A protein has these predicted regions:
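Conserved alpha/beta cores of soluble small-molecule-handling proteins
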Residues: 1-114
Length: 114
């Protein structure tokens, strides 16, 4: 079984140990800093003001025309599962959405798949 004791990540639809989380080198989030993020604190096993963080994160996604690919309820469920898998009671949880990878040779960000 995977070791999530250092943290868990949700990448491309699956949970992985934080040390195995990766994005392709051709992802525009990596190449061009075309991404957005927000960080929420977990204290004593509970998120601190998750609704406010999620609202701000989704507003940033909309402003930069980034599709998180999940509904707010689904994002919440993913974050909760990451904390549950890790067993960490005190932590920071980062929500990140990148532009993704465009088709090879394309410069059109609308064609990128994240």
């Amino acid at each position: 079984t995977p070791d999530y004791s250092q943290g868990a990540a949700f990448v491309r639809g699956r949970y992985v140990p934080i040390g195995e989380a990766a994005i392709p080198i051709t992802d525009w989030g990596f190449l061009r800093s075309d991404a957005t993020y927000d960080v929420v604190t977990v204290w004593d096993g509970a998120f601190f003001r998750l609704d406010a963080h999620l609202e701000r994160f989704l507003a940033s996604c909309a402003r930069f025309r980034l599709d998180p690919g999940l509904s707010p309820a689904q994002i919440t469920a993913v974050l909760e599962q990451c904390v549950r898998l890790s067993g960490l009671r005190e932590s920071y949880v980062e929500m990140i959405v990148t532009r993704g990878q465009p088709p090879w040779g394309s410069r059109d960000p609308r064609l990128a798949v994240n």
